[in-house]
Structures are given as structure tokens and as C-alpha cells.
Amino acid sequence: SAASDVYKRQAITGVKGGLIVIAADDPSMHSSQNEQDSRFYGDFSLIPMYEPSNQQEAYDMVYSGFEFSEKLGEPILMRMVTRLAHSRSGVERKAQKPQNGISFSEDPRQFILLPGNARKRYKVLLARQDEFIKASEESPYNKYTDGPNKKLGIIACGIGYNYLMENYPEGCEYPVLKIGQYPLPKKQLHQLIDSCDEILVLEDGQPFVEKQLKGYLGIG
């Protein structure tokens, strides 16, 4: 919360180099005084977000996330939750990448947020939202898995997907949309909505995806 003012402005200026901001949320307040959901910060900042479902995915997201951030020229928010942050697991490591060379912005004014510059930069950020959605639709962290029973479709976000699979060790009979990268992938979301009678949303925290889903459906 204390860093949100700077964070919002980083989204408007953009970044020159990779930047991942990791937020450790605490659903159910196991070791803090509130259970704020940091996904709302990423949403109002209009930037991409990661939400890993397990330790391997957390490693993979950080490994590829710096390159993704540098390619977009925007910071990436990565949301962790208590049960993932307070656990440990072996992960498959990847080869170390060489450090990219230093480069400088062609227009240094993008980092000077006087109102005239900020308005221009904000228009640039707004114009890139479809690009961010397309990146989510093509992301390996968002996966649609079909199932024979179309009475229910499940959207499982972050560690919620891990919880779901623990209850279906032999595979889930319902179609499942796993969410690990935001903004929500519209193509896969509509595929699930059009295929199923009802939708269940599994998310650890506040109803972030549920509210967006109601917006898509025009209810609530």
C-alpha cells in the first residue's frame, strides 16, 4: 500500500529494463492485519500480472518475467499468497541467462511526469491493453482443459488451481480454465462460458475474477 503511488506512476512511465514487483498477500490474515488482494493494484495500474499455482511456476514466472517486462517496457506484478510463500519444494532449474546490455530511452521525457508528459504516457498505456490481453491468451500460464461434464465450468486462479487438482488426482470431469496471468484471457474465458451451464470461480482472496466475470456476463 505504501508503495502504490510510485507503482502506479511506473506503469505510466514504463520501464527501461525488466522489473517484477512481488507482492506477498495474506488471505485469512495468518501473519498480518489485513488480507488485501494485490491483484486490484495491477488492475487499476493497467499492467500484466502473474499468479503462480505452485513453486515451479513461481520460479518459471520470475525466470521469464524479466524478459517479458523488458519486451513490454512495463513492470509486472507477481502475486504470491501465504500458503505458497510459506512452503518449499524442489524445482527444475534452467540455464542462467546472460545479462542484457544497458540501453537508454530514446525519449527521456517519458520519465518526467509533469502533467503534459503524463497525459501522453497514459494514452500510450491505454492503447496497449489489447496487446496485454493477447499476451495472456498466448501465455503458457493460462490453460483451458476440456471435460466431459458441461454442467459446470471452473475458473481456478493461482493456488486455487493447485487446490482443485488435489481434489481430482485422476483428472477433473469439468472443463477448467487455469489462470496464472492477467489480464484475463478473453478467448479462453468465452470458450468456457459458452460451453458450460454454470461457472465456479476458485480464487484465494477477494472476488477479483468473479467481479470481472459478472461484468462479462452483464449480471450483478
Predicted segments, located by residue:
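Beta-hairpin (beta-strand-turn-beta-strand) motif
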Residues: 24-26, 163
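Short glycine-/polar-rich loops that comprise or flank the Walker A/P-loop
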Residues: 16-18, 45-47, 73
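A short, small-residue-rich loop immediately preceding and capping a beta-strand
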Residues: 1, 16-23
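Flexible glycine/proline-rich, aromatic-decorated loop/lid segments
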Residues: 9-16, 27-44, 215-218
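Glycine/charged-rich beta-loop-alpha catalytic/anionic-binding loops adjacent to active sites
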Residues: 24, 43-51
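Histidine-centered beta-alpha loop that forms part of the nucleotide-sugar donor binding/catalytic region
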Residues: 23-24, 81
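Flexible, low-complexity linker and terminal segments
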Residues: 52-220
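Short, small-residue-biased leader/transition segments that mark boundaries at the very start
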Residues: 2-7
